Amino acid sequence: ESIEVAPDGFSGWRLSTSWGTFNVLHMEDFDWSTIGGEVWGQIPKDARVSQSEGTSFQLLAKDGDWRAEHLPFGNVLEGVEVLGDLIEMPCGGLRFEGQDVLFFWRGEKKGQPLSKALVDDPVATCKALGEKLGKIAMMAMQKSSSVNEERIWNDRLKKMEDRLKTNTLWRASHSPETRGTLTLRHLRPEHIRVVEGGIILGGIWGGLESVLLEMSQKRPAISDLGAAFTVVHEFCPQNQRQEALRTLGESWVSEAPESISSRRALDGHRGGLHIWVYEAMLNRMMMARAMDEDETRFVDRWLAQVSTIQAAMFQARSWSALALMCFSASVLVPLAWLWGYMSWAQMVQVPAFLGAGFLLHQIYRARAPSPW
């Protein structure tokens, strides 16, 4: 269904899908040589398209090479400007009714896609990516930190499970250290490039993903790491995948704030990183169905392991329950002696219960799923 309101060079449409109804601005006979309307920042002068792929355009202009990205669903950069030193921010754009519909950058796109780098040198690439995401987490937490919104995060998982009709069900009792902050939200490989061992992050302004996935901006920084793990599962060769994942996680920990990367914060018994990899896998599945793409096998393989992970976590909790019983008994025995139900000789049970409790608790901790 067409809509009348649209900027010059665009046509407006209302797109109805099983996931909802969205307004879309389609680029149509856009005049790159005279970009008018509500422009901001620096834009190319007298440009023409030299190459295009999807919503991305390479431009030749009087003042050099430029790149442009069309945002059919609009976007607002508000909030992410604080990450400008660590991500590739546009130098200008075209706005319509408060939403950006075009972004511009000077120069050509540099480096190789992350998907190719993960095949050529997965471990080094994961090290650089983890460090980059850790630095972003550090800066984001310094600028903005909200309370733990466990209920909202778990409700979103339920909504996706219901929509996708998955055979999985997973909720997490997130640790108190898990707090919301500015994140990249939907980290996808086409948004990431590798240049001389360094990482260039772009494309955090969204597209259909930002509309369809309904992600709140304030999410835990570890959710970006979970999304990165999903990308590694998709593109990294199997024989190097485990080492690459471990390197990605450890390099993130080396740069991220200790408050969100400590052993307690990554506690697998409380979901840790695994719950965010799970969410990212559901995101990937949802996008595949929305775009009528073949569902990726790596998602199916990972989701098939969820029940195994949950079973191991349940078994580990049995050790925790036994430890709690021993600690409780170490308190009840002295009380029973005070009330006259036990003799002094029986107080020897107290250190035995305490020792057993500590031992069982250590077994419980040792059985926690690996963070990576």
Map each language-model feature to its residues:
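Hydrophobic alpha-helical transmembrane segments
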Residues: 336-354
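Active-site activation/catalytic loop segments of kinase-like enzymes and analogous catalytic loops
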Residues: 196, 207-260, 277-294
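Pre-DFG segment of protein kinase catalytic domains
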Residues: 200-204
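Conserved ATP-binding subdomain of kinase catalytic cores across diverse folds
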Residues: 2-169, 212-239, 356
